[in-house]
């Protein structure tokens, strides 16, 4: 019979903890992927909230993967409230490093931005971002997916269009993404366990009555 080979085109290291907390293993994994998969460094993406340790290591290393940095706001105080465990870096410091790394790596930095209604979806965000923006950068935006019990909601279609227009007017390259499967809670950020209200089939040990 015939054989079919599917070649991986991109690998994203995301959702496994902050890479700067485990640099040796992350760099080893990137090197292994590139060596044995046949894809280039620019097809391996490290996702990070931004950390000086990672930034320093990337500049000093021969390994030059692509980089996706969680930004979510152009305003320092707001960004710290959205990412309370992120390293103490200003938006300006993050974007300055991004510009330097893009120049060395020869491919653009991706900045991640989850749009939240009434939080970070204002045109003022884009106006604050524009003076710091580099040509070798891409802004990836995706509206937040609503989750029961969470106050965070998606912006209206009209507000999303205003954001897109503000990006165009300020020379910011925008890739706008939307999420599928929201109707079945299968979108990004919606996969989670719900507490069962009914009594579990297996009772905790302290509730079991054992007759001897």
Predicted regions and their residues:
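Conserved AdoMet/S-adenosylmethionine-binding subsite of the radical SAM
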Residues: 7-170, 174
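Radical SAM enzyme core and accessory elements
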Residues: 169, 181-212
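Short, small-residue-biased leader/transition segments that mark boundaries at the very start
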Residues: 1-6
């Amino acid at each position: 019979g015939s054989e079919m080979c599917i070649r991986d085109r991109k690998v994203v290291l995301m959702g496994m903890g902050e890479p700067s907390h485990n640099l040796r293993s992350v760099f080893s994994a990137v090197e292994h992927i590139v060596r044995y998969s046949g894809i280039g460094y620019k097809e391996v993406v490290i996702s990070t909230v931004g950390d000086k340790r990672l930034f320093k290591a990337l500049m000093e290393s021969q390994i030059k993967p692509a980089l996706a940095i969680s930004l979510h706001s152009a305003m320092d105080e707001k960004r710290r409230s959205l990412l309370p465990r992120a390293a103490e870096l200003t938006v300006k410091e993050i974007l300055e490093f991004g510009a330097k790394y893009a120049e060395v790596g020869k491919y653009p930095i991706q900045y991640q931005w989850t749009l939240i209604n009434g939080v970070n979806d204002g045109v003022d965000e884009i106006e604050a971002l524009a003076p710091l923006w580099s040509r070798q950068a891409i802004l990836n935006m995706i509206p937040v997916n609503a989750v029961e019990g969470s106050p965070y909601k998606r912006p209206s279609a009209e507000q999303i269009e205003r954001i897109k227009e503000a990006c165009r007017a300020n020379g910011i390259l925008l890739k706008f993404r939307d999420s599928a499967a929201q109707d079945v809670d299968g979108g990004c950020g919606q996969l989670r366990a719900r507490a069962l209200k009914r009594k579990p089939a297996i009772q905790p040990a302290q509730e079991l009555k054992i007759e001897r």
